[in-house]
UniProtKB/Swiss-Prot annotation:
A GO-annotated cellular component: cytoplasm
Cross-referenced InterPro entries: aa-tRNA-synth_I_CS, Arg-tRNA-ligase, Arg-tRNA-synth_N, Arg-tRNA-synth_N_sf, ArgRS_core, DALR_anticod-bd, Rossmann-like_a/b/a_fold, tRNAsynth_Ia_anticodon-bd
Organism: Methanocaldococcus jannaschii (strain ATCC 43067 / DSM 2661 / JAL-1 / JCM 10045 / NBRC 100440) (Methanococcus jannaschii)
Keyword Endoplasmic reticulum: no
This protein's name: Arginine--tRNA ligase
Swiss-Prot/TrEMBL catalytic activity: tRNA(Arg) + L-arginine + ATP = L-arginyl-tRNA(Arg) + AMP + diphosphate
Lineage summary: Archaea, Methanobacteriati, Methanobacteriota, Methanomada group, Methanococci
Residue span of motif 'HIGH' region: 124-134
SUPFAM superfamilies linked: Anticodon-binding domain of a subclass of class I aminoacyl-tRNA synthetases, Arginyl-tRNA synthetase (ArgRS), N-terminal 'additional' domain, Nucleotidylyl transferase
Length: 566
């Protein structure tokens, strides 16, 4: 029973008879249950058209709506121009709990859509480990992938590997001079060498020519589709770094479907074709470099496409990658740091010049720790590995303090990191604070995980006592029960909104509110006590079971495990 759809359809039907056209209607949640469960302000919009007072319109519409006997609606009232709807909670709860019970962890899942999405995220340069800036990208991307798939899209994730350019040439030359520390995790060993070579070049600037020579030789080999000593050196360095990065991603519960190497577009000739096609537009200016004039798109800065000697730049290879990617999907989505805004706009403009569709881009602001900033060039950064290690260590300490089993510290630590990042809208800069991330009481993931564990504990106790759950709901429900039932019903809308707006924080914040609603229910509604009527016991147990299901599904969509005991 979809009560909201029933209400909206009934409103559309009566309003269309008044104004002979369909109108968009949005149901709002009321601030408290005394004012009903849902409200509409449509009468204020109709007042001008009908030349009537909104109060009178509301009263007239209520009379017509009452005559329709809307399924699931117990009462309808006109209040100062608003129309308030009161749910028949006994019917509503019974139907909803049965639906959740039947669908289990598929409750809220969208219908299969024949739409392919390629989602690119993380894509950190392979010159060191992921730091916490990359972590925000990775978590937003992975959570979004899970939500989009659950909503019914066919999703493929890409990691775009920047294996060309100066940074990788530095790593390759650094390995030649200093080697790699085999005792260290691979990406950290690469970072150490990267820092050493930067310091070395500051002291020996005359060696810079060797870096440029390496870059030229690598690109020449790629353009000729050759495999030689230079290409092997680059491939070794990149794969060595990626091995470490993949290990970190695995520890974060993140897996990419495809790793796309930037160099593949030089090797297959696509970069050359992109430059040729852009030349044909008449928008390319040749000075010291080849530059693309994008002033028609409101972008004053020119986009540098190639050096004077014709060698390609990151921008051209990025255009080639997008042309390829967008030809293989219906929707392309990129997750990028806010510092990439201008570059992303330039790539979009170039794609439009070439007659291509353009990607959707999710920009995120920077993340920092109170301790300070991050920099890979001189080796001052907080790696994701260190952050996760610290999270698990602190989670163990919290577990010991609370008498919780230590073996769930990984789930709590990883959940704390993933959730604390997912819950903040990407447009907002964030400071990662441990006291918030590992908060068992109010805002952290452990608070939500604890609500789930409490559900498991209640259900286990009921099983031991031989009490079965059943959606009876033949009694006057408390305000806490009503609030929790409404929250569970909202899950479907939350999935839709998160998927369609590409915003994972909507789901994250919903789960926190659901856990709070469950705790209020638990504190005020006895479940297994002897004095509780059998039908009430069964119904409340069913409510606990449904809450457990939705918390479990929601946390899984954020890539977070749910311990059964805490």
């Amino acid at each position: 029973m979809d009560i909201k759809s029933n209400i909206i359809n009934a409103l559309k039907e009566v309003i269309s008879k008044e104004i002979c056209k369909e109108i968009d209607i949005k149901l709002d949640k009321t601030p408290n249950l005394e004012l009903g469960d849902y409200s509409v302000n449509i009468c204020f919009r109709l007042a001008k058209e009908l030349k009537k007072n909104p109060k009178i319109i509301a009263e007239e519409l209520v009379d017509k709506l009452k005559a329709m006997n809307i399924e699931g609606v117990k009462e309808i009232k006109a209040v100062n121009g608003y129309i308030n709807f009161y749910i028949d909670y006994n019917k509503f709860a019974k139907n909803l709990m049965e639906e959740i019970d039947k669908k289990g962890n598929n409750y809220g899942r969208g219908d299969k859509k024949s739409i392919k999405i390629i989602l690119e995220h993380t894509s950190a340069n392979p010159n060191g480990p992921l730091h916490i800036g990359h972590l925000r990208n990775a978590i937003i991307g992975d959570c979004l992938k899970r939500i989009l798939e659950f909503y019914g899209y066919d999703v493929e994730t890409h990691y775009y590997v920047n294996d060309m350019g100066r940074q990788m040439a530095l790593v390759v030359y650094g390995i030649e001079l200093f080697g790699l520390d085999k005792e260290k995790k691979k990406d950290h060993a690469i970072a150490e060498t990267y820092v050493k070579i930067n310091k070395y070049l500051e002291e020996h600037p005359e060696e810079e020519e060797k870096i440029l020579e390496l870059m030229r030789k690598y690109e020449d080999a790629l353009e000729n589709n050759e495999d030689n000593e230079i290409t092997k050196k680059f491939e070794f360095a990149v794969n060595y770094a990626l091995d470490g990065i993949k290990e970190t991603l695995k520890n974060l519960n993140i897996k990419h479907d495809t790793f796309v190497w930037e160099s593949s577009y030089v090797r297959n000739g696509m970069v050359k074709k992109v430059i040729e096609k852009l030349m044909e537009t008449g928008k390319v200016i040749k000075e010291e470099t080849y530059m693309l004039d994008l002033s028609d798109f409101g972008i004053e800065k020119k986009m540098v496409l190639a050096r004077a000697n014709g060698t390609s730049l990151y921008s051209t290879r990025d255009i080639a990658y997008h042309l390829d990617k967008l030809s293989k999907c219906d929707i392309g989505i990129d997750v990028l740091g806010a510092d990439h805004k201008l570059t992303a706009e330039m790539v979009k403009a170039a794609l439009k010049l070439l007659g291509s569709k353009v990607p959707e881009v999710i920009f995120y602001e920077f993340i920092s720790l109170p301790e300070g900033s991050m920099s890979t060039r001189r080796g001052r950064f907080i790696s994701t590995d260190e952050l996760l290690e610290e999270a698990i260590k602190r989670a163990k300490e919290e577990c010991n303090k609370r008498g919780v089993e230590e073996n769930i510290a990984y789930d709590i630590g990883l959940g704390a990191v993933r959730y604390n990042i997912a819950r903040i809208s990407p447009e907002k800069p964030m400071v990662f604070r441990w006291e918030e991330a590992l908060d068992f009481e109010k805002v952290g993931c452990p608070f939500i995980q604890y609500a789930h564990a409490r559900c498991c504990s209640i259900l286990k106790e009921a099983e031991n006592k031989g009490v079965k759950d059943e959606a009876v709901f033949n009694y006057e429900l408390t305000s806490e029960e009503k609030e929790l039932i409404k929250m569970l019903d909202e899950f479907k809308d939350i999935i839709k909104e998160s998927a369609e707006s590409r915003r994972v924080h909507i789901l994250a914040n919903y789960l926190l509110e659901l856990a709070k609603a469950f705790n209020r229910f638990y504190a005020n509604c006895p479940i297994l006590m002897t004095k509780v009527d059998d039908d009430v016991k069964k119904s409340r147990l069913k409510l606990v079971k449904s809450t457990k299901t939705v918390l479990e599904t929601g946390l899984e969509l954020l890539g977070i495990n749910c311990p059964g005991r805490m």
